[in-house]
């Protein structure tokens, strides 16, 4: 059973009524087909209205859905012969990041991604998808290996952020993130990054320096969570919904700002409704990205990546008051 979100409550009520009528028809000698048909038509119309007019906060809720497909879900559906690699060769193995070698339509690739859990036990094991420094160093080790053997790199981004604990800071969390940014900028192989859930702060960006950056339609990508932004700006985390509206964290906002390259459509209601169909949408975009990038040599890949990030945040015009000075 799929957990329903707050904004889906009207749909839940209608579905419940339809189910009750169907159950009643089984036990009573009454034909309620016409009534059920009307309710189903009303449900379909309401679904279209709700999912076509999602607010940024609605999308935050979908991105955080406990049953939303994870990196391993997509690896299972998109790749073959996946061999997971463990450890950073410095400290340990961080299970908040998974990565390894696989084949994508026969092409050897390296796949890396944040991995959260879907229940309490797995979330504790995966640290709720918040990596320690050794996770980022493991990712970097796999990236450098991919570069050595000329394998394209595919990164799945899905984290609230890097783990901010004392031990993580002592082991060099900020250095590990900064090192990944530096090294990813200079990789001579294609790098495709896909935001599949939450993309939070430097913890997400440490896997996000790619030639192509795509986002699932209901994913988010931001420097801080809406709750964190609200707590800083207005000293009240309960204003997270207002912050989400202001922060421009949705795929549509980021496409307009030039931060991402393509929005990957989601199945109605969110990727958690049908992981198989969602994987097909990702496959379509990923296949096209790799075809374009594999045609470029290493020097051109580095240049393209550099120019891409250099253009982010550039001012395209100056107000008259500034020009007058």
UniProtKB/Swiss-Prot annotation:
Name this polypeptide is given: Acetyl-coenzyme A carboxylase carboxyl transferase subunit alpha
Top-rank EC class of the record's enzyme: transferase
Protein family: Belongs to the AccA family.
Cited Pfam families: ACCA
Keywords (A to Z) from UniProt: ATP-binding, Cytoplasm, Fatty acid biosynthesis, Fatty acid metabolism, Lipid biosynthesis, Lipid metabolism, Nucleotide-binding, Transferase
Reactions that this protein is recorded to catalyse: N(6)-carboxybiotinyl-L-lysyl-[protein] + acetyl-CoA = N(6)-biotinyl-L-lysyl-[protein] + malonyl-CoA
Subunit structure: Acetyl-CoA carboxylase is a heterohexamer composed of biotin carboxyl carrier protein (AccB), biotin carboxylase (AccC) and two subunits each of ACCase subunit alpha (AccA) and ACCase subunit beta (AccD).
Keyword field contains Heme: no
Organism taxonomic ancestry: Bacteria, Bacillati, Bacillota, Bacilli, Bacillales
CoA carboxyltransferase C-terminal domain residues: 35-292
A cellular-component GO term for this protein: acetyl-CoA carboxylase complex
One Gene Ontology term of the molecular function aspect: ATP binding
EC number, as in UniProt: 2.1.3.15
Subcellular location: Cytoplasm
Keyword Electron transport: no
Role summary: Component of the acetyl coenzyme A carboxylase (ACC) complex. First, biotin carboxylase catalyzes the carboxylation of biotin on its carrier protein (BCCP) and then the CO(2) group is transferred by the carboxyltransferase to acetyl-CoA to form malonyl-CoA.
PANTHER family according to UniProt: ACETYL-COENZYME A CARBOXYLASE CARBOXYL TRANSFERASE SUBUNIT ALPHA, ACETYL-COENZYME A CARBOXYLASE CARBOXYL TRANSFERASE SUBUNIT ALPHA, CHLOROPLASTIC
Organism encoding this protein: Geobacillus kaustophilus (strain HTA426)
InterPro entries from the UniProt entry: Acetyl_CoA_COase_a_su (IPR001095), ClpP/crotonase-like_dom_sf (IPR029045), COA_CT_C (IPR011763)
Predominant cellular place of this UniProt entry's protein: cytoplasm
Listed GO biological process terms: fatty acid biosynthetic process; malonyl-CoA biosynthetic process
TM region(s), chain numbering: none
UniProt pathway: Lipid metabolism; malonyl-CoA biosynthesis; malonyl-CoA from acetyl-CoA: step 1/1
């Amino acid at each position: 059973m799929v957990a329903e979100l707050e904004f889906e409550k009207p749909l839940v009520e209608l579905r419940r009524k339809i189910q009750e009528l169907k159950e009643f028809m089984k036990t009573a000698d009454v034909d309620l087909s016409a009534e059920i048909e009307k309710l189903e038509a009303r449900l379909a119309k309401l679904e279209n209205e709700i999912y076509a007019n999602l607010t940024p906060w609605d999308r935050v809720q979908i991105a955080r859905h406990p049953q939303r497909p994870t990196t391993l879900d997509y690896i299972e559906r998109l790749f073959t012969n996946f061999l997971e690699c463990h450890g950073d060769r410095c400290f340990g193995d961080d299970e908040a990041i998974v990565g390894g070698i696989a084949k994508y339509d026969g092409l050897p690739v390296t796949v890396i991604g944040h991995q959260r859990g879907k229940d309490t036990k797995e979330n504790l094991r995966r640290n709720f998808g918040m990596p320690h420094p050794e996770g980022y160093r493991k990712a970097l080790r796999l990236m450098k290996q991919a570069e050595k053997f000329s394998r394209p790199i595919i990164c799945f981004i899905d984290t609230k952020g890097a783990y901010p604990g004392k031990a993580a800071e002592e082991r060099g969390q900020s250095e590990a993130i900064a090192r990944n940014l530096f090294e990813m900028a200079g990789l001579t192989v294609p790098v495709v990054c896909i935001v599949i859930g939450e993309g939070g702060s430097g913890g997400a960006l440490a896997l996000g320096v790619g030639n192509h950056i795509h986002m699932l339609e209901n994913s988010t990508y931001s420097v801080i969570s809406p709750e964190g932004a609200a707590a800083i700006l207005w000293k009240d985390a309960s204003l997270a919904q207002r912050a989400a509206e202001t922060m421009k964290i949705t795929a549509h906002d980021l496409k307009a700002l030039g931060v991402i390259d393509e929005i990957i459509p989601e199945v109605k209601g969110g990727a958690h409704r049908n992981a198989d169909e969602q994987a097909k949408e990702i496959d379509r975009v990923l296949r096209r990205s790799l075809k374009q990038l594999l045609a470029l040599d290493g020097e051109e890949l580095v240049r393209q990546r550099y120019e891409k990030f250099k253009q982010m945040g550039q001012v395209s015009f100056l107000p008259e008051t500034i020009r007058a000075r």
